[in-house]
Structure formats: C-alpha cells, structure tokens
C-alpha cells in the first residue's frame, strides 16, 4: 500500500488554508462546496458576466461570477462530481427490481415455510390411509357414563376441586408401581399408544370433576376432543418436573406416556407409516421447540413445586378455556360456569387451607406456565394446518376434530 498523501498549502481560489484536493484542485471546503453548487448544469451563475468586468485579482471577496470563473481557471472540473453517494437517500430511492418483486428468500422462492423447505411436491400424497379412533371415543363415552352414576358426598371433601385432586392421587398411586422405561424409537405403535393413553387419561380426569359430570353428554365429548392434547402436555410436564426435582431423570429427558420417558435429542423417529417424506425433511415440523416452550415452563414447575390442587386448577383453566374458545355457545357458557366455581374453590384453598392472604404473585406465575403451553399448542395447530395444505402426511383420522386444537 502506498504511503498516505498529505496535502497542504493555501486554497488556489481564495488563498485561505486548504483542506484537500477537491475536483482536481487544492482548495478549501468552502470553495469546493461553492463550485459544487454553482457549476451544476443550468446554475444561475453559469453564463452571467461580472458587473465590474472583472473583480480585483487579490480581492478575497470576489463576486460569485468571478469566483466561479477562478475555479474553472485553476482546473476545477465538474466531470469529477460523484452522485448517489448518500446511503440513506439511495436506499429509500426505489430501484427497478424492488418495484416488481419483494426481496427473495428461499422460502419465498419455493413457496414453502422454512421448516419444510426440503419437501418435494411430487411426494405429496392425495391418497389417504384412515386411522379409526372410534373405539377411543366409545371408551370415553363409557367412562363418562360409569362415573356419572358415582355418588359424591360433599361431607368427604371441602369442594369439588379437592375431590378431583384426591381421586387423581389415588389413581396415580396405583400406577406408581409400574417400571419407568426409556423410549428409543417413536413409530406407529408408540404414537398410537400416546394417543390412547392421553385421550383416555383426560377422559378419566374430566369424569372425576363433579360439575363436568352434570353437563350434556355431547358437550362432554366436545370438550374432551378439543382439550385432551393440551391436558396431556401439562400433565406430562408436571410429571417430568416431579422426576427432575427428585433427580431421577436427566435435564434433557421428558415424560412421554404414563410410564415412558424420552430424550427428544436422541430418540429415533419413524414416520414411514404416515408420510412419504423422510425424517430429515420434516425434522423442523416433527421436533418441538423445546427451548422456547418446554424448558422454561419445566423450570418454573420445578421451582414453584405446585401442589396437586394447584396443578388440577391449572389443568381446568387450560382445558376449559381451550374448549370455550373453540365452540362458543352452550359450551362456552358451561365452561365459564365451571371456571367460576373452581376459581372460588381455589381462593378458598389458598386462604383457608394454606393461609395465604396474598397469593396473586404465585398464581400469576402458574398461569404464565399455562400461557406457554397454550402458545406451544397454537404453534402445533399452525404446523398441522400447513401439513394439511402441502399433503405432508397420508394418514387421516376418523374423528379429525380430535386433532384440530383451538
């Protein structure tokens, strides 16, 4: 690299200290700026004549006409003007390509979201394979009919929330003797097992809520079909938090079914039974955003260590809000009534049993966990919609409303 060029001396136009070479001449900034303005095409001083004929040569206060003439005499050249140097104004000025199209990304170019960029349209399947889940719905009906005949004595429990909690504790106590297994592969059998255990587990939970048992049978099924997945999400996160608190599971291991856990980063996924695409092509669709939705909620559950009464209240809030938002009408009316009753029960539990007068801060943190789970389910709903539009899977269910989360 050549050494830096240092220029010094008087301005060749006004003889004031120069600041550098401007338009081919050693000049000050003032004369350079003057020439830049005056020498433009159609400038008002370009063709005028000095009134005096010519200003005194050594007069520092030349008229503008003579000053421009002096600039030209010493060698200033308008061909050395540089235009479009202003980055801000240049960026705001529309160009030919921005007028016709938006900036192209790979997702825009292919017309597919980023997490399915590798999908090939020729692998989309218009022929669907039906998975019949009618037997699960029939089993849920049977659970609701069986528990509807069960008599509840208010003398045994302070309120319906604590009744629900007590009965669910008894069920989990019976199942606690089962050996915990680690899932290394998730394929057709594992996916259907998760569906069966989660759907029927939610049905058993709902059946033990007295206010729910009084609802119309069709409303019960509608609520269950809408909320079983969101129920399973919180139920399994709460179970995972219990194991993490006891140091029985690693930080990256989560509960999958009632007695099965998995590490999402190590588990092998088999989707040959449901899609023509490979796991690598659909990994962004299949693997949940654990850092965004699961890990923070799990950390809060471990720290807060909610009681079983609090946990069941969180489940009620999640499930009934989800069902009410989707169905509106009679379903919304029924869910709002139950939510109001359970809110009163929760207030009574905090103030009378736990002796907490100011519990709003703790309850707000519990509801924050619920909002994170709701966001996760909304994200899954959007992905399911995209999967349907692009025919990513060739499997359909006999009751598709079970997989249309609110």
UniProtKB/Swiss-Prot annotation:
DNA-binding region in chain numbering: 8-83
Molecular function per GO: DNA-binding transcription factor activity; sequence-specific DNA binding; zinc ion binding
GO CC annotation: nucleus
Cleavable signal peptide: none
Pfam families: Hormone_recep (PF00104), zf-C4 (PF00105)
Record-linked InterPro entries: C.elegans_Orphan_NR, NHR-like_dom_sf, Nucl_hrmn_rcpt_lig-bd, Znf_hrmn_rcpt, Znf_NHR/GATA
SMART domains: HOLI, ZnF_C4
Organism annotation: Caenorhabditis elegans
The protein's name: Nuclear hormone receptor family member nhr-133
Cellular location(s): Nucleus
Presence of the UniProt keyword RNA-binding in the record: no
Domain NR LBD: start-end pairs: 150-406
Chief location: nucleus
């Amino acid at each position: 690299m050549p050494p830096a060029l240092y220029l010094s001396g008087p301005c060749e136009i006004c003889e004031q200290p120069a600041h550098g070479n401007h338009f081919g001449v050693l000049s000050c900034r003032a004369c350079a700026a003057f020439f830049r303005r005056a020498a433009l095409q159609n400038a008002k001083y370009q063709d005028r004549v000095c009134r005096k004929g010519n200003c005194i040569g050594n007069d520092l206060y030349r008229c503008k006409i003579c000053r421009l003439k002096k600039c030209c005499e010493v060698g200033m050249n308008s061909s050395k003007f540089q235009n479009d140097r202003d980055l801000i104004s240049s960026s705001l000025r529309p160009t030919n390509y921005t007028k016709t199209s938006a900036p192209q990304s790979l997702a825009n170019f292919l017309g597919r979201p980023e997490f399915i960029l590798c999908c090939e349209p020729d692998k989309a399947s218009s022929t669907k394979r039906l998975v019949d889940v009618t037997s699960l719905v029939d089993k849920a009906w049977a659970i609701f009919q069986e528990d509807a005949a069960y008599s509840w004595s208010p003398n045994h429990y302070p309120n319906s929330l604590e009744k629900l909690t007590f009965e669910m504790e008894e069920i989990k106590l019976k199942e606690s003797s089962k050996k915990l297994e680690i899932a290394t592969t998730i394929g057709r059998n594992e996916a259907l097992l998760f569906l069966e255990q989660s759907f029927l587990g939610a049905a058993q939970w709902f059946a033990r809520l007295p206010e729910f048992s009084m609802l119309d049978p069709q409303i019960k099924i509608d609520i269950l079909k809408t909320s079983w997945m969101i129920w399973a999400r919180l139920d399994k996160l709460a179970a995972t938090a219990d194991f993490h608190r006891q140091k029985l599971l690693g930080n990256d291991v989560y509960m999958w079914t009632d007695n099965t856990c998995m590490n999402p980063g190590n588990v092998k996924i088999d989707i040959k039974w449901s899609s023509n695409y490979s796991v690598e092509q659909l990994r962004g669709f299949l693997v949940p955003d654990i850092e965004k939705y699961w890990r923070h909620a799990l950390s809060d559950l471990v720290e807060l260590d909610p009681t079983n009464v609090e946990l069941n209240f969180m489940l009620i809030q999640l499930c009934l809000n989800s069902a009410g938002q989707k169905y509106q009408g009679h379903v919304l009316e029924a869910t709002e009534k139950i939510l109001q009753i359970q809110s009163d029960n929760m207030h009574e539990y905090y103030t009378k049993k736990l002796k907490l007068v100011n519990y709003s801060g703790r309850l707000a943190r519990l509801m924050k966990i619920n909002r994170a789970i709701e966001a996760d389910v909304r994200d899954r709903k959007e992905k399911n919609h995209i999967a349907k539009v692009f025919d990513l899977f060739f499997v359909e269910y006999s009751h598709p409303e079970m997989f249309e989360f609110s």
